[in-house]
Amino acid sequence: MTSSIKLVSGAAILLAALSGQAIAQETIKVGMSGKYFPFTFVKQDKLQGFEVDMWNQIGERTGYKVEFVTASFSGLFGMLETGRVDTISNQITITDERKAKYAFSQPYVYDGAQIVVRKGNSTIHGIKDLEGKTVAVNLGSNFEELLRKNDPNKKIDIRTYDSSFEQDVALGRIDAFVMDRVSTAQLIKESKLPLQQAGAPFETIENSLPFLKTPEKQALLKKVDDALTAMRKDGALRQISEKWFAADITDK
């Protein structure tokens, strides 16, 4: 009888341990800034936006519990490298440098790099007009990289911010900022700040989800990619886009 009790107890302990592992494996940690309207932002103490809705759908389809981890954009890749998050969902652009380090999901947003100036500014129409000007970008963002790539002779005074550079442009403290076309249109509409887009986007960008190149993360990437494919096929991804942008930015 004692042996039977020990056997059952041992099996119960093993089952509990395995169950605990399974529960842990069903959580995916997604890093984002929570400061990039309307992709990821906080309103009335609630994290929301296009990226949040997309991940809630991915969670439902994969069976994973999605845990959002917010931090300044400049710290997100460090969190990915150290395993504090499984991926980053913050309009991450695929670049050659990033492809060498990370595995990427299929693109889920197609957009462009857009210059924004104070309303009434008629001197800036494109990237060449930024020479000699002070231009803001998010620290460590895709747009900082793009702007520096387009300024090989360092004629642009590039200022890096964690957030809220639109206020400085609206007040005339700096000349312009660079962000994605879709977000700038929504920002101008919702904030009522005296801002305007300057010319057409100067570069096309594709946004994707980066994962570490380990077997565990590759398996996770496959499940996320399958969910994105299904969402594209049944129209769920398009519907989320239309909710936030009144347009489909998920297709070329």
What are these regions (language model features)?
Residues 29, 64-65, 81-90, 133-134, ...:
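Alpha-to-beta junction loops
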Residues 67-78, 122, 157-171, 182, ...:
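Short helix-initiation/N-cap motifs at beta->coil->alpha
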Residues 33, 110-117, 185, 189-225, ...:
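Periplasmic-binding protein-like
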